Amino acid sequence: MAHERVVRCASGALVALAGLVAVLPAAALPPEENQSWVELGAWVNSDDSYKFGDFTGLEEKGISLLANFDVGRRAVWDSGDVRWWRAQGQNLGLDSRWARGDFGYQGLFDVWFEYEEIPKFQTDSAITVFQGRGTDRLTLRPSWVASSTTAGFGALAENERDLDIEHMRRDVRAGFGLDLPADLEWVGDYEYETKKGLKVAAALIGNTGGNPRTSLVAEPLDYQTNEGQTALRWNGERVQLQLGYEISVFNDSNDSLTWQNPFSQVGGWQAGAGVGYPTGFGRKATPPDNSFNQVSMAGGVDLPWNTRISGDAAFGWMRQNADFLPYTVNPLLDAAVPPPRGDADAGIDTTAATLRLASRPIDHLRIDANVRYDDRDNTTPRDVYLYVSGDSLDQQGIGSDRARLNLPNSYQLVEGGFEAGYEFFERTELSVGYQRQEIERTYTEVDQTTENTYEAALRSRPLSWLQARVEGSYADRNGTEYMYRSPLFGGFTPEYVGSITDPDELFENNPLLRKNNFADRKRSRVLGRIDLMPIDALSIGLDGAWVDDDYDQSTLGLTQREALSSTIDLSWTPIEILTTYVWFTYENLKSDVDGRSFSNAAQASDPERDWFERDEDHVYTAGVGAELHLFDDRLRLRADYVYSMANTDIEVGTGEALTPTSRNFPDVESRLHDFNVSAEYQFRENLAFRVSYLLEDLKSDDWAINGVAPDTISQVLGLGEDTPHYRN
């Protein structure tokens, strides 16, 4: 279906109670500041919708408990009681619940505890033919009929089962703060996070050309992350110091995902090795266990002439030593040479330091300066890996293109700059700045990049009802010689490189291709905002931003990128009890990518084999709303409406040697209407009733998802999912 319609409705009625204050007589109340409140009620959801429930927890039709609270006690400042506590909770009846508790003695210590759940609902319209969902081994039913392409899957329909892709993140956090003698303070916190559920993964079997076959499958998630940090602080009158330590440990309960190959034998797969169905299996590693530790220092000192110097330094180490999997799960493939070691013994040592200066030496003048150093030393040892391509081919020798060396990339960054501003008129400042960044890298096409950025800004408030600012910058990034042969010489064995007799074939990527994070680039940026309040009841804001990236030395790759956005917002209070607002935002994003299709050196230099892609996004978003207070503020009415329209245009074209010579993809479109209205009535000081209603209507059209059945693509067994939709 070209357009999927989403209509989401939810309504909630709640009663807000004032907790302790509501049940104690006034004379019994302690002399404290108490603004506690409790909300109780119900969410009524009109229908099931994964899209509506994404992050909110309102994915199912029916009634859910609405429960929020914020209760606590803190004595008035002169009571002599230094105890305080606070308890908070939100969405307690939903899968997006959050709760926190704090307790402390002011000036002595405080402790806190926090719990949070975050649901992620990706799709409930997927289809799978695999058994064992949620486990690390996926198999096919005995009734499966294999083929070399999806068109021949004769038993596809009878093997299809519904598949929901979702996961839940749960976080438990705790922390403390302890005031010590001599202006010392000790703080710390700890977080334990779990992530369980499913995500979509590409399960590939094959090795080159047209023989790879892929199945989109459900990969199980069972992650645990432990993070902790602590710091000792000294807060002097003019000097502040801090010494800290932090640790992060990630664990994955699964080390791999194994799946049965639904495709029959394909040309290019190892003959006689049972690669195809039913004996063929594939296996991929899941994220490995790893850890990170860091020791840090920070401090600041106040100097004469209204000057302050601050800085920080950190030394860290990352480690990853999860066991390697065998090269292949297929026992009939020849893989006699094992990996060169049992694990990667991977490590990265980090060193970072920053020094900042902020000074106001004379009236109307400010000077800010900074220097930053960031070094990442990848200590992972290099080795030759005789990998088996996609569980489909016998292991090849040291002189083949299947013998690869890992590239432990390191970098060293040094940057510094300044900004100086002078108020040459009252409440009007002109500032200029300069920033220089140098990055040295290893095992990349460019050894060093240098970027110079020039900045200027004007900020002014010439009148009490007018405020404006405009900022602009120009950055020029240049690199040393682009060594396009670097991936070949660094990633392949000398034996293989030596077997290439034609110098024109000594490359892995096209010699004219430039990776955009290394390529020469000129970046222009302008942004501004104006705020007006011509009368007390009316405020108007206008802002805009434009960024243009020009990769003028890139023949192939990303050559141009541009982003434009503008917003106007207006707020009007015609009478004291009524506030209205309206706003509109437009965003435009463009990118140009040029490429070349080739399979040999002659084609790599043929411009008639060029292709291009031009993407352009248009996003229009508007909103209007009002809030009305009646009956001495006892009745509060609120209404909001938001409309958003997004279009993506994709234009492609090719040279004369390729077909088709010109073709545009269908536009990707979405339309969203969001209407929210609520009414709240205050029966008495500590009791209120509120009812709210939300209506959301979404239409979307994405050619890459809608209408793509599991067997639409001949070499890919898909999930057949739709764009998120809900129908009333």
Regions found by a protein language model. Give the residues of each.
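Bacterial N-terminal signal peptides
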Residues: S11-A22
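Gram-negative and organellar
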Residues: A28-S36, W43-N728
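Amphipathic, positively biased hydrophobic alpha-helical segments used for protein targeting
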Residues: A22-V23, E696
